Swiss-Prot record:
Catalyzes a salvage reaction resulting in the formation of IMP that is energically less costly than de novo synthesis. Its main location: cytoplasm. Homodimer. One of its GO terms (biological process) is IMP salvage. One of its GO terms (molecular function) is guanine phosphoribosyltransferase activity. This is Hypoxanthine/guanine phosphoribosyltransferase. It comes from the Archaea. Keywords: Cytoplasm, Glycosyltransferase, Purine salvage, Transferase. GO terms for cellular component: cytoplasm. Transmembrane segments: none annotated. It is found in: Cytoplasm.
Amino acid sequence: MLERLKDSLIRSPIIKRGEYNYFIHPISDGVPSIDPHLVEEISDYISEIADMNVDTILTVEAMGIPVANALSLKTGIPLTIVRKRPYFLEGEVELSQSTGYSKGVLYINGLKKGDRIIIVDDVISTGGTLLALVRALQTIGVEVMDVISVIGRGDGYLKLRELGVEPKILVTIDVGEKGVEIKDVFGNQ
């Protein structure tokens, strides 16, 4: 189960950013090259475990796009991308997000009250982006049926529980100076 993903995570190079051990992986960083078989493995697994009775697959620009797009192609469900710049379309919703390493503004377009969506993200660590996104979607009246993160690091996912959302994290990891350690795989509980 998710053997390509687990193997690729274990082989991820680690760099230091200050005191932070940062793993470099195709799903979270786009480097090295993104293996289409890896993306296929991930999207196949998501389609099996997620509530796919939705109107739209939603992801945040940029690194959630490869997996969310593969899932959209596999299921025929449209894909909506939350962007980092405004388009000034009618109904555009602006939200501020803050993570452990950045702050910014995101823009949601094309969703309306009553839409049922699944969120697909590459990594959840602090939970800042997903927390702001889910709050904004709930304010609009969009039903968040599922939140999927390919990789989980830390306990930021716990913040989503406060909003009544239980994210599904495919692979939970720890990152140390010596490398990535697989802590859990969704479905092994």
